[in-house]
Amino acid sequence: MVEKSVAFVEGVSKELYLKTGVRFVIDMTDFEKNPIALATKNERQNYQEGFLKQLKPPFVVFFFYHDAQKIELVANPKDLLDTDKIFFEKIAPLLPTNAKEYTPQRISAMLINGYSVAVDALAQKYRVNITQNFNAPKGVTFVKVVIYILLLTLLGAFLGLYFFKKS
């Protein structure tokens, strides 16, 4: 992750823990700073089990395996967070489709998006306000507006080319 993202995660995690008692950790492997090769699913599961034994519930851990191109979101207790919903609705759409797209900026954006949504869900559950977190509704609205503008631009370009070719 880029340095700004690391600082953001540390600040929000600290505030979340102080207000709710829930630890939120992002664990990234296969990098120079954490060179652990975990190619098979069994290796990743064993690594996760060992990592999770070090934490006391309640906690949420976001595992990111760069080389295997896998992500795992784990909550303990399991009903603490709807991890599947967050993964499939907020993280999966941002997953890179090829190896060239696995840049530090793209990885940071993907992880921060999922992290921020998960923190918002935890804050709502515990009825607290996490002041250092992104305001999710504004971010979602902004992304939707940008996507609509891009779609309308593409549609306009397509229709313009279609009608000018016929003339």
Regions found by a protein language model. Give the residues of each.
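Folded, non-transmembrane soluble domains that reside on the lumenal/extracytoplasmic side of membranes
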Residues: 1-141
